[in-house]
Design a protein with these regions (language model features):
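Glycine-rich, N-terminal phosphate-binding loop and its surrounding beta-alpha-beta segment
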Residues: 49-89
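Residue-level signal for inorganic ion chemistry
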Residues: 10, 34, 86, 146
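Short beta-strand-loop/turn "lid" adjacent to the catalytic site in phosphate-handling enzymes
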Residues: 74-121, 142, 148-157
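Phosphate-binding/catalytic loop of phosphoryl-transfer enzymes
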Residues: 122-123, 129-210
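Electropositive phosphate-/nucleotide-binding environments in soluble metabolic enzymes
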Residues: 60-64, 68, 80, 101, ...
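Ser/Thr-glycine-rich phosphate-binding loops at phosphate-binding pockets of nucleotides
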Residues: 11-16, 210
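Short glycine-rich, Thr/Ser-proximal phosphate-binding strand/loop in the N-terminal lobe
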Residues: 15-60
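Extreme N-terminal starter segment of soluble prokaryotic enzymes
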Residues: 2-7
Length: 210
């Protein structure tokens, strides 16, 4: 098999989740979870073919160290040369982004601009993104924004009942969260029911913390 695979990364302030997927079937070939990043006892756990093993990251306990360990794991299984692109979850794209986008310097600057809207998450996403650009040189990186799904809200839904100048001056408005999850659930529900998504009326509950 030589088809290209997709690597997806979800970086938190002290963690990194990753998976390698077959772009056609959606099958997860390898997954990983790095924990306690930026602490002396950082480590990353890999799962491949149903088996798990842990790699110590204490020598380089940051996001870059985790991505480097991931690259070594991919090489060990002959998957590194089959990665065709990298996808990144980013919590907030603010009003700048309403869809997924190919990463360039302008996009990185845009994510930085949105840090005040997600001060815990966006800096961590940028660390993982920059590490991926350095370690997986030449591969396209795409960011998927959690806020993008909710950018379809009409103006009366995303604006609060406060003076308009607060929106104009401070950008005070409603942003939805976990939009990537909601998009998946709504798409799968439409597929399961055999209906067009725009014809559905659904209440969706996001359970969990990620």
């Amino acid at each position: 098999m030589s088809q290209k695979l997709i690597l997806v990364l979800n970086c938190g302030s002290s963690s990194l989740k990753g998976a390698v997927l077959d772009n056609d079937s959606g099958e997860v070939l390898l997954s990983c979870l790095a924990e306690k990043l930026n602490l002396p006892d950082a480590y990353i756990t890999f799962k491949f073919n149903g088996e798990k093993h842990k790699v110590d990251l204490s020598a380089k306990p940051d996001h870059t160290g985790a991505v480097e360990a991931l690259m070594e794991e991919l090489k060990a299984h002959g998957l590194d040369s089959r990665i065709g692109a990298i996808g990144h979850r980013v919590v907030s794209g603010g009003e700048l982004y309403s869809e997924s986008i190919l990463v360039d310097d302008e996009v990185i600057a845009g994510i930085e601009k949105c840090i005040p809207l997600a001060p815990l998450h966006n800096p961590a996403h940028l660390l993982g993104l920059r590490a991926a650009q350095t370690i997986f040189k030449g591969l396209p990186n795409v960011v998927v924004f959690d806020t993008a799904f909710h950018q379809t809200m009409p103006e009366h839904a995303y604006k609060y009942a406060v003076p308009h100048e607060l929106y104009e001056k401070y950008g005070l408005r409603r942003y939805g969260a976990h939009g990537t999850s909601y998009r998946f659930v709504s798409d799968e529900t439409a597929r399961f029911l055999g209906k067009d998504k725009k014809d559905l009326r659904m209440v969706i509950a996001h359970l969990g913390n990620g």
